[in-house]
């Protein structure tokens, strides 16, 4: 499923900010709700991150809510607020409140993984399970900025003349193991979205190292990580496995930062098996 047929919807937070999401109903009798939380980067959005996955979960009778985080996609891009983990978790909380969702499964990639962990730590009663792909918030800022992908992402400010389409194309190839999988359609999709972004989100982003708090998360957790990840060190998976709790992991070679895009069938199948067998919190 590569085209988004769900109507764009918006909710307004108590602070007056607008948050964009799409709501994809279960095909049959609903088994639960999954909220998909995308990662960071130029041109990122919820649908761009998860367009290869939503249909499989709908067909398995899960309601899927896909939203754009602050500073991304069609959601507001405030320049007067620092983009801390708390601010991103506030956004997720506003979404859950606005849709009257009491307890959901969180599916998060990269920054989205850190936000999912942040919500599980802040309001554990609202999180049933977690499915995370190379989550952020597991290393120090210095460790992340030593990664080739992060260095490339922050070299030129978003919206600056130096951040050209070719720079974006190069960055996208770093997200995956197979560079040939980055086609013109994806580059154009991200480039179009990038035109609406500003540099404030990356300039003020502050995500703490949560690795020493993993043991406080009781919910079942499934983690995917590619060994060729150039953005989040694959060694982070061992921190999470050793951190305690109910943690399972799928480690893939010949895979970069985008497991759900590079290996969608494996990701979808393994995630659905996890959802059906893991105990609810």
Residue ranges, per PLM feature:
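Flexible "cap/lid" loop of the alpha/beta hydrolase fold
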Residues: 117, 121, 128-160
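Active-site loop/oxyanion-hole signature of alpha/beta-hydrolase fold enzymes
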Residues: 22, 51-55, 59, 66-107, ...
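Gly/Ala-rich beta-loop-alpha elbow adjacent to hydrolase catalytic centers
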Residues: 108, 112, 116
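The serine-hydrolase catalytic nucleophile loop
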Residues: 41-54
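Conserved alpha/beta-hydrolase catalytic His-Asp/Glu region
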Residues: 146, 161-219
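Alpha/beta-hydrolase fold catalytic core
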Residues: 1-37, 45, 59-62, 173, ...
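Catalytic active-site module of serine/aspartate enzymes centered on a nucleophile-bearing elbow/loop
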Residues: 246-281
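Conserved loop-alpha-helix segment in the C-terminal half of the alpha/beta-hydrolase fold
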Residues: 216, 220-255
């Amino acid at each position: 499923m590569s085209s988004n047929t769900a109507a764009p919807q918006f909710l307004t937070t108590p602070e007056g900010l607008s948050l964009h999401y799409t709501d994809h109903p279960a095909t049959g009798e609903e088994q639960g709700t999954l909220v998909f939380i995308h990662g960071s980067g130029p041109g990122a959005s919820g649908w761009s991150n998860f367009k290869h996955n939503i249909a499989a979960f709908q067909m398995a009778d899960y309601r899927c809510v896909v939203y754009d985080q602050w500073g991304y996609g069609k959601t507001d891009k405030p320049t007067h607020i620092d983009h801390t983990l708390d601010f991103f978790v506030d956004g997720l909380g506003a979404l859950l409140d606005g849709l009257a969702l009491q307890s959901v499964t969180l599916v998060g990639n990269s920054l989205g993984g850190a936000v999912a962990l942040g919500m599980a730590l802040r309001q554990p009663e609202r999180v049933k399970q977690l499915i995370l792909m190379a989550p952020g918030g597991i290393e120090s800022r210095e460790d992340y900025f030593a990664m080739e992908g992060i260095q490339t992402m922050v070299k030129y400010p978003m919206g600056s003349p130096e951040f050209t389409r070719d720079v974006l194309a190069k960055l996208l190839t770093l997200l995956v193991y197979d560079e040939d999988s980055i086609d013109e359609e994806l580059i154009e999709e991200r480039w179009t979205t990038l035109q609406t972004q500003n540099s404030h989100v990356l300039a003020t982003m502050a995500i703490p190292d949560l690795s020493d708090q993993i043991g406080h998360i009781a919910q079942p957790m499934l983690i995917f990580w590619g060994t060729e990840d150039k953005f989040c060190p694959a060694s982070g998976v061992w921190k999470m496995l050793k951190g305690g709790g109910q943690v399972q992991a799928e480690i893939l070679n010949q895979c970069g930062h985008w497991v759900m895009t590079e290996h969608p069938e494996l990701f979808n199948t393994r995630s659905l098996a996890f959802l059906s067998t893991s105990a609810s919190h």
